[in-house]
Regions:
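Acidic/His- and Gly-rich active-site-bordering loop/insert found
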Residues: 43, 69, 87-95, 100-104, ...
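Active-site-proximal beta-strand/loop segments in catalytic clefts of secreted hydrolases
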Residues: 46, 131-134, 156-160, 182-183, ...
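Acidic/histidine-rich catalytic neighborhood of metal-dependent amide-processing enzymes
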Residues: 211-214, 244-289
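N-terminal hydrophobic or amphipathic helices/low-complexity stretches enriched
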Residues: 4-76, 165, 219-221
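Soluble metallo-hydrolase cores and metallopeptidase-like ectodomains found primarily
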Residues: 167-249, 269-270, 274
């Protein structure tokens, strides 16, 4: 009798352990929209300071995504989850921004940064210029184009005199610098040039070469003959301006990145697909890449 009891207990234990093993092999993580919302809030928060490519916050997010892929058992496409490359990135040089109008009689008018003018982030080949009516100045209804020996510069009206907009950064853009101005500044520049004044401007940004990375993770499929399914989302955005305004980019593109991260987490639990699924978190989309 005792032997039978031991036998049945052992059999029961084996069945339970086998059931748990099978259950663990076939459990899956359903796609959770609440996780996506939470992730969007985190990625677009001040913690990541706008995720500008080349910034330390952007690098922190690279590592967060890499760890996420690794924790969910995705494998690198090559030897590393990160595919590194170099870009030219704007950096705040902490100089004092100014737009000054200097007249022949010695009078000088200083316009207010963030109220009368502000950089448009699209390019910073030059961030300090001086010009007058002796330079080539083309006037249009909503912008002023200035050509000097240092290059071409554009002063354009901010939509509705609102400086909250920030462009993507394009290093090979044809203008050396673009500056947002309001209607009063537009008129002051034109009137002062007619009066023979000299205009000087400094924008508190410069450029540096930075190494950044895309982050790639793969769910391996069972077939080597089928082409892979490639899913991408860019995780960078526009960073922080000199007034400490943070461009969080919840829709562009914390939302897409968060969706992709939740999707890979879910799909990684469904067992092997037929084809490889490659997840690519792209960097420097806001630099035109």
């Amino acid at each position: 009798m005792r032997k039978k009891i031991i036998y049945y207990v052992s059999l029961f234990t084996t069945i339970v352990l086998l059931s748990l093993s099978l259950f663990s092999n076939f459990t899956y993580s359903p796609f959770n929209a609440d996780n996506v919302k939470k992730s969007i809030a985190i990625l677009s928060s001040d913690t990541y300071a706008g995720r500008l490519a080349g910034s330390k916050e952007n690098s922190l997010l690279e590592e967060l995504i890499r760890k996420n892929f690794q924790d969910n058992k995705l494998i690198p496409l090559n030897d590393s989850y990160k595919e590194s490359f170099k870009v030219i990135s704007p950096v705040n040089n902490n100089s004092t921004p100014y737009l000054k109008i200097s007249y022949d009689d010695g009078y000088e008018e200083n316009l207010k940064y963030g109220v009368d003018f502000k950089e448009d982030m699209i390019n910073f080949k030059n961030t300090k210029i001086t010009f007058s009516n002796e330079d080539k100045v083309n006037v249009f209804s909503n912008y002023i184009e200035v050509s000097t020996t240092n290059g071409k510069f554009l002063f354009h009206l901010a939509p509705n005199n609102n400086f909250s907009f920030r462009s993507s950064f394009i290093h090979d853009f044809p203008y050396n610098m673009m500056v947002l101005i309001n209607t009063d500044t537009y008129n002051k520049i034109l009137n002062s040039l007619r009066d023979g004044a000299e205009i000087s401007i400094n924008i508190p940004f410069s450029t540096e070469e930075k190494e950044i990375s895309n982050v790639v993770g793969v769910i391996k499929g069972t077939s080597k003959s089928l082409p892979p399914l490639v899913l991408t989302a860019h995780f960078d955005h526009l960073g922080t301006d000199a007034l400490k305004n943070i461009y969080g980019g919840a829709l562009d593109n914390a939302s897409g990145t968060s969706f992709m991260l939740e999707l890979q987490k879910s799909l990684a639990t469904y067992g092997k697909p037929k084809r490889d699924i490659i997840f690519v978190a792209l960097n420097a989309e806001e630099f035109g890449l």
